[in-house]
Amino acid sequence: MKLYGSFGSPFTRRVGTTLLLYNLKHEHLVLRANVPEELEQLKKFNPLARVPALETDDGMALVDSVTILDYLDRLVGPDEALTPSTGAVRTQMLSLIGIGAGAVEKSVSCYYEEGVNAKRPADKIYRPWVDKMYEQTKDGLEAVESMVKGPWIMGNKITQADVSLVCFLDFIVKHRPETAPQLNCPNLEKISKKANLMVEFSSTIPA
């Protein structure tokens, strides 16, 4: 398999980390949509030129991290999958991850507005909208924080909830300016610190 994308994307990172946790043989090729020569190559696997994209061993191109993770779960089987295949716990986990994904998407939007690689001129930024997105990021993460059930998010063992939320939280913390409302997520921060000691996480931390 071949994973396309940069670990600077929290969505690419969660796929890369999952591949390592599943011990699935793969090649990681760094392709970034904001680099013109890499953009054209990326379009071969995703017409939207978004990351991540996964090329399976039989040549199928999968796009969107949700689709890719579902494929990997089915590949390793229900006994090894980090997401339950059925039941209420699956629904709870996917809902929780969905909140986290929404929070990091708001953070990504803020990054494009006023981050290092901002796309919009400073005088064209609509401050009330950006401030609202920072607030939504905070509210989303703190909602997930309130759902933590043990040493890992869902209880006593690591699941896809931890993989995804660690990748999401790390991106948010790295790119959140000091002027934004302070996050209050001690349990998620503790889980992130613990997870990032594992080689499967530490080897996907972006530079």
Model-found features: residue ranges?
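Generic structural "secondary-structure junction" signal
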Residues: K44, P84-S85, M154-N156, P181, ...
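Long hydrophobic alpha-helical segments typical of transmembrane helices together
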Residues: A180-A207
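Short, contiguous strand/loop micro-motifs
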Residues: M1-L3, P128, E178-T179, S203
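GST-like domain detector, emphasizing the conserved glutathione-binding G-site
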Residues: M1-R127
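Residues at alpha-helix termini
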Residues: Y22, F45, H175-R176, V199
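Surface-exposed helix-capping loop/turn segments at secondary-structure junctions
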Residues: P78, S146-N156, V199-I205
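GST-like fold's C-terminal all-alpha helical module
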Residues: G100-K190
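Non-transmembrane alpha-helical segments in soluble domains
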Residues: L69, D73, L94-I97, L141, ...
